[in-house]
Design a protein with these regions (language model features):
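Short, acidic, metal-binding catalytic loop of nucleotide-sugar glycosyltransferases
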Residues: 21-32
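Conserved donor NDP-sugar-binding/catalytic core segment of glycosyltransferases
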Residues: 97-135, 208-209, 213
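Catalytic donor/gating beta->alpha subdomain of glycosyltransferases that bind UDP-sugars
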Residues: 181-243
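Glycine-rich, basic loop-to-helix element that forms the pyrophosphate-binding segment
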Residues: 64-80, 101, 157, 161-165
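Acidic donor-binding/catalytic loop of UDP-sugar-dependent glycosyltransferases
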Residues: 44-45, 92-105, 193
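Membrane-embedded multi-pass helical conduit in multi-pass membrane proteins
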Residues: 253-321
Length: 332
């Protein structure tokens, strides 16, 4: 078997239903695969939903005590049979051509990379039926203006490190690395960094994109990016030298937005223009595109301020690396 698709879930049965429905519509790629759903101690189980798909796709349901998404992925990997372990978040929806894009990319790997090619990931985007807030959040998490090119996309200014919302690792390398570390945040980046540090190659597969719903409101999004800022410090302590100038951008943004009023005005106008144009290219009419553009300003401020404040908080914390993961907050 070539592919094992592993999905950790905690109290999100409705998301699993949508995700499995999308996976049931995958275009044939000529390779055998399996789907493993790992219930991480949920109080709202999705077992009945998963069992309902057993007749139409090769899905298995596993359950364990709650320990967080990293350990849940490791649990699924232990039961996996595939040569490649593909990790998806439960809040993704998969287009029909996703697995075929992965198969094509593996067939096109450079000859001098084939022995040491160990991991890849795909980008994410917003679906046309996402809410305006979800589209604004998606913009803020994928725009070059707000991320500096460190997330999935064509314009990269750092090495690509796959993230677990849409990430694949060669099974033998995953086991060699010991799987995901028991970190509170940033366990996917940590694994990607360890893979690269061990001398393996990684890449972005641009055509293997997924729809990623992310958070449904700005308060949940704020908690997520606060944790992302904390994770960056944890990663820099585990991987000395990994902290780059681009990672300081959110903190610099916070300082500039407080001290320099013209900077705020210019940034808001740039985001409004860029997001509105992007939404119109995606088929939105001008009024709705402009409304999402306005929301994108708010989402961008939440992202950059949340990340920057989390970054500073972790910088002065001794527990940024050692805190364990064990509950719902780490799926929110």
């Amino acid at each position: 078997m070539k592919y094992s698709i592993i999905i950790p879930v905690y109290n999100r049965p409705e998301e699993i239903s949508e995700l499995l429905d999308s996976l049931s519509r995958l275009s044939p790629c000529g390779q055998e695969y399996e789907i493993i759903v790992v219930e991480d101690g949920s109080t709202k189980p999705c077992e009945a939903i998963v069992k309902g798909y057993e007749a139409v796709e090769p899905v298995r349901y596993l359950k364990k005590e709650n320990a967080g998404p990293g350990p849940a992925r490791n649990f699924g990997a232990e039961a996996a049979k595939g040569e490649w372990l593909i990790f998806l978040d439960s809040d993704t929806i998969i287009p029909a051509g996703w697995l075929c894009a992965i198969e094509r990319s593996l067939g096109a790997v450079r000859e001098d990379w084939k022995c040491n090619y160990a991991a890849f990931g795909g980008p994410d985007r917003a679906s046309a039926d996402f809410t305006p807030v979800q589209k604004a959040i998606s913009y803020s998490m994928t725009s070059f203006l707000t991320t500096g090119g460190i997330r999935g996309g064509k314009r990269k200014i750092t090495r690509f490190f796959p993230r677990s919302f849409n990430m694949a690792v060669r099974a033998d390398v995953f086991r060699e690395m010991g799987g995901f570390a028991p970190m509170r945040f940033g366990e996917d980046m940590d694994l990607s960094m360890r893979i690269v540090e061990a001398g393996y190659h990684t890449s972005l597969v641009e055509d293997a994109w997924v729809f990623h719903k992310r958070r449904t409101d700005l308060s949940k999004f704020g908690r997520q990016v606060l944790n992302s800022g904390r994770a960056r410090i944890a990663l820099s302590r585990r991987h000395p030298g990994s902290l780059k100038l681009v990672h300081l951008f959110p903190l610099c943004f916070v300082i500039a937005s407080v001290l320099v009023l013209p900077f705020d005005v210019l940034f808001c106008l740039l985001v409004l223009f860029d997001s509105t144009i992007k939404q119109m290219k995606d088929g939105q009419g001008f009024p709705s595109a402009f409304a999402i553009g306005l929301m994108s300003i708010g989402a961008s401020y939440v992202q950059l301020w949340g990340y920057g404040l989390g970054f500073v908080a972790a910088l002065f914390s001794k527990t940024a690396v050692s805190e364990n993961i064990n509950n719902e907050r780490f799926y929110n």
